[in-house]
C-alpha cells in the first residue's frame, strides 16, 4: 500500500488520519492511520496483546482470548460506544487472522453488529523512521443507529484508539536519544 507524499508528511508531523465513507445498506467505512516511533515488532506486540487491550485502549471494557489455533484467534470484547447522552455497551466475538508483523484481519462472528470486519496493517520502510499502523473497517450495528451517528462516533473515537496503540508500542520500545 503506497501512501501519497502529502499523507506521509502529515503522518510525520504527528497527525492522526481518519477518513470515513458511507457504503450501501447503511454500512460505514472507516480508515485510520498513525505513525508510531517504534519498530514494527513493538507495534505488533501492542496490537496483539489481546487479553490486555482493556487496559490500553479507550472504551474497551473487557478483552479476552477465547481460543487460539495457529494464526487464528477467537476474541471476546466488550466496549462502550456512543456520544453525548447516547452511550451503549456492545459485546462481540471476533475471528482474527494474524499475518505476523504485517496484518491482523478481523470479522465479527457473533455480537451487536450486523457488519464488523476489517484489518489492522503494519508497514515499515527504509525511507521512514517508525511504523505506520493503518486501520480499515466496515461497520453496521444491529441496534438502531443512523450511519451519520456511527460515522461521527468513529471519527471521534478512532484517533484515541490509534494514539493509544502508539503510546503502548512506544512505551514497549523507548527510542534511545
Report residues per predicted region.
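One face of beta-strands
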Residues: 16, 30, 77-79, 88-92, ...
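Hydrophobic/aromatic beta-strand elements that line small-molecule binding cavities or substrate pockets
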Residues: 31-34, 63-65, 91-96, 117-124
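Hydrophobic ligand-binding cavity/cleft-lining segments
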Residues: 1-70
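Residue-level preference for beta-strand/loop junctions
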Residues: 26-28, 71, 88, 114, ...
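Hydrophobic pocket/interface hotspot
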Residues: 43-44, 53, 96, 122, ...
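Glycine-rich portal/gate segments that line the openings of hydrophobic small-molecule binding cavities
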Residues: 23, 54, 64-110, 163-176
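Beta-strand/loop substructures that line and gate deep hydrophobic ligand-binding cavities in soluble
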Residues: 107-156
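Beta-strand elements of well-folded, non-transmembrane domains
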Residues: 36-40, 50, 79-83, 98-100, ...
Amino acid at each position: 500500500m503506497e501512501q501519497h507524499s502529502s499523507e506521509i508528511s502529515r503522518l510525520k508531523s504527528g497527525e492522526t488520519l481518519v477518513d470515513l465513507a458511507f457504503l450501501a445498506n447503511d454500512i460505514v467505512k472507516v480508515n485510520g492511520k498513525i505513525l508510531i516511533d517504534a519498530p514494527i515488532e513493538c507495534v505488533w506486540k501492542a496490537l496483539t496483546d489481546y487479553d490486555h487491550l482493556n487496559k490500553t485502549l479507550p472504551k474497551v471494557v473487557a478483552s479476552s482470548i477465547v481460543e487460539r489455533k495457529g494464526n487464528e484467534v477467537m476474541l471476546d470484547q466488550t466496549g462502550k460506544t456512543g456520544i453525548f447522552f447516547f452511550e451503549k455497551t456492545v459485546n462481540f466475538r471476533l475471528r482474527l487472522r494474524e499475518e505476523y508483523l504485517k496484518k491482523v484481519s478481523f470479522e465479527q462472528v457473533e455480537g451487536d453488529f450486523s457488519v464488523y470486519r476489517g484489518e489492522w496493517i503494519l508497514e515499515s520502510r527504509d525511507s521512514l523512521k517508525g511504523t505506520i499502523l493503518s486501520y480499515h473497517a466496515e461497520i453496521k450495528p444491529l441496534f438502531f443507529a443512523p450511519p451519520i451517528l456511527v460515522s461521527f462516533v468513529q471519527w471521534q473515537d478512532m484517533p484515541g484508539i490509534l494514539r493509544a496503540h502508539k503510546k503502548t508500542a512506544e512505551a514497549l520500545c523507548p527510542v534511545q536519544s
